[in-house]
């Protein structure tokens, strides 16, 4: 993957805004606990546009970052990117995970006009620690402008309350990967939860094998279309215990 190291070290507090935003399709910045990706994986689905991402601050296990973009024209129903902060962690089988505490506080702004995006966690599992994606578990904190998840039927298969938040659960395929999407029934901009509870629900009720390894944990935004849009994550933290 093309990218750069943004001079982030394991200091108690370190501001890296001076490192500047990065705008390349696969650019990223790494700290001890996180990798922050620009990840413009589907930019060619837009008629025009660009996106840049930057890290603002690191304090212990908490990171602050932002991403700004304009995506116009083309396939308005397709995601263009997934700028995100990915946790660096040791892969574990779901049955051996005790907790996945996480917090995320963010704000979103955009110019007038059509704006479609989601804010979501994205978890992937596999039957081996080094295997390819078999299950994808998304947790949508926000669905702006009519954004919708992958679904075989277009309808939720369940309504689930986890912690103090209610979610509609959708299921569908993405190639050979089975995708579960928990979509919050109302926008959450200040989120605190144990993500293990989402995995536990799926293993008990939706057939997710507890022998699967959690191999990826990310949180970010999927834009479909928008002008002068910016997501600012004032704080994000996560751990797999």
Curated annotation (Swiss-Prot):
Name of the gene this protein is made from: XEG1
Compartments, record wording: Secreted; Host
Native source organism of the sequence: Phytophthora sojae (strain P6497)
UniProt note: phenotype after gene disruption: Severely reduces virulence.
Claim: Hydrolase is one of the keywords in the record: yes
Primary subcellular site in the record, as a coarse category: secreted
Function (record text): Glycoside hydrolase that exhibits xyloglucanase activity. Acts as an important virulence factor during P.sojae infection but also acts as a pathogen-associated molecular pattern (PAMP) in soybean and solanaceous species, where it can trigger defense responses including cell death. XEG1-induced cell death can be suppressed by P.sojae RxLR effectors. The PAMP activity is independent of its xyloglucanase activity. XEG1 induces plant defense responses in a RLP kinase Serk3/Bak1-dependent manner in Nicotiana benthamiana.
One Pfam family, short name: Glyco_hydro_12
Annotated protein name in UniProt: Xyloglucan-specific endo-beta-1,4-glucanase 1
Main enzyme class: hydrolase
GO terms classed as biological process: polysaccharide catabolic process; symbiont-mediated disruption of host cell wall
GO cellular component, one term: extracellular region
GO-annotated molecular function: cellulase activity; xyloglucan-specific endo-beta-1,4-glucanase activity
Signal peptide start and end residues: 1-19
EC number(s) given by UniProt: 3.2.1.151
Family membership noted in the UniProt record: Belongs to the glycosyl hydrolase 12 (cellulase H) family.
Reactions catalysed, as given in the entry: xyloglucan + H2O = xyloglucan oligosaccharides
Active-site residues (renumbered): 136, 222
Activity regulation statement: The xyloglucanase activity is inhibited by the binding of the host apoplastic glucanase inhibitor GIP1.
Annotated keywords: Carbohydrate metabolism, Glycoprotein, Glycosidase, Hydrolase, Polysaccharide degradation, Secreted, Signal, Virulence
Complex formation: Interacts with host apoplastic glucanase inhibitor GIP1.
Glycan attachment points: 174, 190
Induction: Expression is strongly induced within 30 minutes of infection of soybean and then slowly declines.
Bridged cysteine pairs (disulfide): none
């Amino acid at each position: 993957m093309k990218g750069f190291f943004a001079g982030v070290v394991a200091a108690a507090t370190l501001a890296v805004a001076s490192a500047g935003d990065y705008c390349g399709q696969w650019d990223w910045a790494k700290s001890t606990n996180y990798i922050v990706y620009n990840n413009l994986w589907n930019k060619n689905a837009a008629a025009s546009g660009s996106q840049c991402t930057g890290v603002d601050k690191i304090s212990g296990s908490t990171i602050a970052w932002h991403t700004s973009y304009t995506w116009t024209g083309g396939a308005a129903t397709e995601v263009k990117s997934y700028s995100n902060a990915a946790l660096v962690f040791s892969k574990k089988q779901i049955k051996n995970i005790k907790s996945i505490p996480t917090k995320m506080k963010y704000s979103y702004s955009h110019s007038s006009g059509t704006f479609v995006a989601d804010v979501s966690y994205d978890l992937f599992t596999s039957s081996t620690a080094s295997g390819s994606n078999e299950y994808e578990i998304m947790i949508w904190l926000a669905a702006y402008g009519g954004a919708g998840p992958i679904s075989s039927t277009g309808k939720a298969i369940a309504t689930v309350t986890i912690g103090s938040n209610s979610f509609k659960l959708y299921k569908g395929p993405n190639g050979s990967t089975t995708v579960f999407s928990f979509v919050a029934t109302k926008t959450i901009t200040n989120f605190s939860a144990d993500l293990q509870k989402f995995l536990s629900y799926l293993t008990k009720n939706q057939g997710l094998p507890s022998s699967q390894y959690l191999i990826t944990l990310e949180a970010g935004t999927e834009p479909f279309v928008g002008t002068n849009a910016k997501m600012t994550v004032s704080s994000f933290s996560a751990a797999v215990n």
